[in-house]
């Protein structure tokens, strides 16, 4: 497990490089670290998988030195990045439930059964925790009580759950009778459970991940499906543009700044498209092959995780 400091480039304050803060050998495979909304400078959390024990563990870590403050078993911790929900840490329990533990002590506080497979992220919206179970979205309060259920008949919901103008945006699959196949969709649902509109992303084998779903910017949603990057105008529920890229990009959403859209693919391509029309600005091919996570933007730097390495790219040009 590694913590690196982000250091400013002396010649350009908007570009950065990394150096080690600390590095600790772990007797397990380390998954994605995560933090609370306030991005505490003191504590972080991580899920690990021990092949020897064949078990997942949820750990609380001191960010100053990497010391493990507590560790608990996390059944099915391998899917779905956990989240911090006030003074609780919530993660998936088995395949169809979520469980909350005290962020202070790691003691179990409550669990909520969804009844069907959970393939969404865990999302905190207006002091409630939202997740999807099969074709249903559930909202849970800090006491572990289900306070709302929204249903999309015959669907399977996956990816992130995003608030938009009092409603909820989510993605999922549904059988398209006209095309006689399963297609991915983007839905906007109001708080009463009515589907305001449904937008087809396209025919695609679903390979969902912790970063599937959409990127929301103002009144525009950016999504990926198969080999396509797609932009939707949410004010009218209409697709604005669609761009084909090299490799499967539907596993995770693109990321967006004020002018451009950045994507990665399972063929090892990192690319940048114009936010207005989807035209490709630059492409970069990595010999590492599979890139299974979206890039991250920090200043003028684009962070890309490819295989076992983190690459820092100039986001304007794509140069490493």
Identify what each model region corresponds to:
Residues 2-7, 28-58, 72-99, 112-138, ...:
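Repeat-blade elements of multi-bladed beta-propeller folds
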Residues 5-32, 65-67:
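A short helix->beta-strand "capping" segment at the edge of beta-propeller domains
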Residues 7-8, 18, 37, 46, ...:
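Generic low-polarity alpha-helical segments
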Residues 17, 40, 65, 105, ...:
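Alpha-helical structural elements
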Residues 20, 62-68, 95, 116, ...:
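Non-transmembrane, interaction-prone segments in cytosolic or luminal domains
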Residues 20-26, 67-72, 107-112, 145-151, ...:
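A short beta-strand motif characteristic of beta-propeller blades
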Residues 62-65, 102-105, 141-145, 190-194, ...:
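Short loop/turn segments that connect beta-strands within beta-propeller blades
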């Amino acid at each position: 497990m590694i913590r690196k400091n982000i250091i400013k480039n002396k010649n350009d304050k908007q570009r950065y490089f990394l150096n080690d803060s600390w590095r600790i050998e772990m007797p397990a495979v380390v998954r994605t670290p995560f933090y609370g909304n306030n991005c505490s400078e003191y504590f972080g959390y991580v899920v690990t998988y021990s092949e020897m024990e064949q078990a997942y563990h949820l750990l609380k870590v001191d960010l100053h030195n990497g010391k493990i403050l507590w560790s608990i078993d996390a059944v099915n911790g391998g899917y779905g990045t956990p989240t911090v929900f006030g003074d609780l840490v919530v993660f998936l329990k088995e395949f169809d439930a979520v469980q909350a533990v005290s962020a202070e002590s790691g003691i179990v506080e409550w669990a909520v059964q969804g009844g069907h497979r959970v393939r969404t992220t865990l999302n905190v919206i207006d002091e409630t925790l939202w997740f999807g179970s099969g074709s249903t979205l559930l909202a849970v309060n800090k006491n572990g009580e289900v306070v709302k259920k929204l249903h999309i008949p015959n669907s399977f919901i996956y990816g992130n759950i995003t608030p938009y103008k009092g409603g909820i945006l989510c993605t999922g699959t549904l059988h398209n009778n006209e095309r006689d196949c399963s297609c991915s969709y983007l839905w906007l649902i109001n708080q009463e459970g009515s589907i305001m509109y449904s937008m087809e992303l396209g025919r695609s084998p679903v390979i969902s991940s912790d970063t599937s779903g959409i990127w929301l910017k103002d009144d525009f949603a950016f999504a990926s499906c198969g080999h396509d990057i797609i932009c939707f105008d949410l004010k009218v529920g209409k697709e604005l543009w669609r761009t084909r890229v090299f490799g499967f990009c539907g596993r995770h959403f693109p990321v967006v700044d004020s002018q451009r859209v950045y994507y990665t693919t399972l063929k090892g391509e990192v690319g940048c498209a114009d936010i207005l029309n989807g035209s490709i600005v630059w492409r970069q091919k990595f010999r590492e092959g599979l890139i299974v996570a979206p890039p991250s933007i920090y200043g003028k730097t684009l962070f890309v995780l490819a295989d076992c390495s983190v690459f820092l790219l100039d986001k304007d040009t794509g140069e490493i």
